[in-house]
Amino acid sequence: MEKLQFQGGARAIDEYAEYRRIVGDDDGGKLFTPEEYEEYKKTVLPMRLQNRLYVSWRSPTGMDCKLVGPETPCFCTHRYKQHKTDFQELPKERPLLLPCRVSKCACKSFHYIPLNGSRPIRCRCKHFADEHSVAGTYHCTQCTKCSGFHSSFTCGCSQPAYTHDTVVETKEERLAQGKPVGHDVPFAAMGGLTGFSSLAEGYMRLDESGAGAPSTSFLESSESGTSHPFLKMYYQPIKVQAVSEPSGIVTQVSNMRISEDDDMAYFERRYQERLLKEKEQKRQKNSKPPTTNRP
């Protein structure tokens, strides 16, 4: 079979990916010419770097449970990148509205709604989020008893979804709260993404936008995250055994994970120790003198 080779093919793919991340849907589906592309960058990029908006789904505790990115869906089912995200001058009124740019969509501003797996969450009227109107109070289109979308879906932060708010803020407003803003990037509709960790849920992030860094007492504790998961589960029983039995310290050392061992070697060593222990118990049982019944 003949092998096809294209000179510079990988470079062309990288250039197109960069073009799509910068332009987004602003070209209307027709690629800009090189001259139009350069003119677009001269016009839009300075405005985008200066007036970037950070969008997050925030819990009542102040944690950003979800940092919105270009592909994050809105209540209207359209992506964040399909909403208005670039402003020549930021509006003075708050909250900032980011209307949907898709034709005939009545969405007046981006509104994040979480998913339950891959499906929309349900309202208290038992209908899904995409069965509600995207305008006004988000009333249900399938029934008349629903006055507006209201879901008791529980977020990973243990707070219900209806207590969260979609927050749109500027770089200065975010810095004033001590939250990360990342580097200035030319890409469209970056929202609240500031790094790879932004893809994680808020309760899993260790920066100021999430749960925060662990305390010093946690990092210095003997059962810290450097321990093996087996030790983290059985640390207290091992600790009690070390005090109650003379050979407890030997057992504790045997249970410790050696950094050079991989997982299979670790559990194999534990398995061999258990076999030796069973053989020793069996040998001691067989070595006991038989009991004789005297008349």
From Swiss-Prot:
Positions of disulphide bridges: none
Domain of life where this protein originates: Eukaryota
Positions with biased composition (Basic and acidic residues): 272-283
Pfam family, one: FAM221
Segments for region (Disordered): 272-295
Entry's family note: Belongs to the FAM221 family.
Protein name: Protein FAM221A
Primary gene name: fam221a
